[in-house]
């Protein structure tokens, strides 16, 4: 950006010359983390919804959501082609449920990690979270299950501090809680 902070404060229009489209969008939208108040404890007897979304998957050419489906969110911000990975006998060329789950898990864990770090006065400018999700055979019922491994890189933190931060994050991250204790899931026929 070529406009100084003082000029911006005075009302000058910013110039986005030399920035990538992603950087430009981030600056235009003033992306910022959620408030630290997200960590305030809720006191109540029932689940209190804060945000809800719906994604619809249609079957596509093969009439099979996993093999040729399209996933669309109700707000239009997500539209993805779903394809069976080559490793499972499909053509690849699209995303799949495991990648979407891994992306959600990694993003949620990263967000919770940063909220806790901010509350503790720790800057995590270079933190990364990898979620490795594996689809495989379940020895319990002979069908299928998922296994997730979350790997966190906190290169600038002392090991003891990093380990404590990760332990605390695992306690509060909604995806980690879901993996550990299950989730309320209602399956219903609508038509």
Predicted regions and their residues:
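Extended beta-strand/beta-hairpin segments
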Residues: 2-103, 110-191
